[in-house]
Amino acid sequence: MLGVTYKGVAFPLLFTMLDKRGNSNWKERTRLIDRFIQLFGAECIDSLVADREFVGKEWVEYLNNRRIRYYLRIKQNFWLRNPKSCQDVRAWHLFHGLKLGRERVYDKLFLLKGEYVYISGALLKNSDGVPKLQILICYNRPEEAVATYKQRWQIETCFRAMKSSGFNIEDTHLRDIDRIARLTAMVCIALAWAYLVGEHKDINVKAIRILKHGKRAKSLIKYGLEEIANVLLRPLYKPKFDVFKFLSCT
């Protein structure tokens, strides 16, 4: 799935259903990027971020050749080669002694599986509060790697909304891949609809309550989804605005 990040949420644009377990391979990912470029143009891509499952020689080579700016997380035990000294080193070794909350950027190129990349990293706490080393590779602008990669959490917001905290797409227990694809496409549209409705209601009708830690009591997507459900399922409900106008591009 390929999405665009916007105000805390990654909105799905394109996806491919895979009739297998595990992650996509590099050919499947490149076909998805090629579809995006054909539809929207390469100039629309500011940068691409992806987690550790989406790293490989052919994939990085494809992004380098296409000159697509990317920030990919790699595993700590990956081997990197200094092209000048021809010495190999584990990725984690380059960040030995890094303090919590700090980042380190290398302004020289390393070889990762034969591809030239820049290396950046930071020692940050994960969602459980445990310090974890985050090592990133990129094609250019390594000084922006850590800050840009933080946008990746927005895809988790999207998946959470599609699954447990919104549409509960997994509860359908569908197995036919074509039906799953059609359902996913409908949910992608509904996700954007719910977000726009929730955003409008939050700004113009009633703001979502802010909790002590500074976050909203519920997401804009869930807020919008509740409003849409009220309009569709409660005949006596009197909405303060027309939720259906957000389905129009005009």
Language-model segments: which ranges?
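Short beta-strand scaffold segments in enzyme catalytic cores
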Residues: 1-3
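Single, function-defining residue in the core of a domain
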Residues: 5-250
